[in-house]
Swiss-Prot record:
Gene3D superfamilies associated with the record: Cell division topological specificity factor MinE
Source organism per UniProt: Rhizobium johnstonii (strain DSM 114642 / LMG 32736 / 3841)
Function statement: Prevents the cell division inhibition by proteins MinC and MinD at internal division sites while permitting inhibition at polar sites. This ensures cell division at the proper site by restricting the formation of a division septum at the midpoint of the long axis of the cell.
One of the protein's GO biological processes: regulation of division septum assembly
Name under which the protein is recorded: Cell division topological specificity factor
A Pfam family per the record: MinE
Family to which this protein belongs: Belongs to the MinE family.
Superkingdom of origin organism: Bacteria
Keyword list, A-Z: Cell cycle, Cell division, Plasmid
Length: 86
């Protein structure tokens, strides 16, 4: 037994934090595609209640970094689109 080990304890908090970050990133990436699909369909349904649109002219992108995820939806609405009353 080394006496210096008693005074020089290993710090496990950084290793535990890193493992948790890896786990959270994995969970976000696996559930992300289902969430994007669900959000896309719900947002398009709401827009379609008010304006006629072409579902093929919709682009959805999601950007992820360490702290935030950004969902961007680009919907092309024609100038002659009929506006429906809600």
């Amino acid at each position: 037994m080394n006496i210096f080990r008693l005074f020089n304890k290993q710090r496990t908090a950084p290793a535990a934090r890193e493992r948790l970050q890896v786990l959270l990133a994995h969970e976000r990436s696996s559930a992300g595609s289902d969430l994007v699909t669900l959000l896309r369909e719900e947002i398009l349904a709401v827009i379609a209640k008010h304006v006629q649109l072409d579902h093929d002219k919709v682009q959805v992108t999601i950007d992820r970094n360490e702290y935030v995820s950004t969902l961007e939806i680009d919907v092309e609405i024609p100038l002659n689109a009929a506006v429906q009353a809600a």
